[in-house]
Regions:
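Ubiquitin system architectures
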Residues: 1-83
Length: 83
């Protein structure tokens, strides 16, 4: 298993997706917050990812535990409401 995961993240606010490489043991919530900052979201939101199966990932799991693999396409979502 790789120590990192390379993903493509889309945001409803920005047309062009961005690519990120995260440690596979990073929490989903922390990775989503980093991606959110790159897309210009304010800090303090409860951001997470939704995978291509439209499953919202648990912010408290690591990316590996959430089943995130290299090349996955993820959507940035706010669990506190719409972004």
């Amino acid at each position: 298993m790789s120590n990192t995961v390379h993903v493509i993240v889309r945001s409803p606010r920005v047309a062009k997706p961005k690519e990120f490489t995260f440690p596979s043991d990073e929490k989903v919530g922390a990775a989503a917050s980093q991606a959110g900052e790159a897309f210009g979201y304010p800090k303090g939101l409860n951001l997470t990812f939704e995978n291509e199966k439209e499953q919202v990932l648990n912010r408290d799991q690591t990316l590996a535990q959430a089943g995130v693999d290299n090349g996955d396409k993820l959507e940035l979502v706010d669990t506190g409401g719409g972004v």
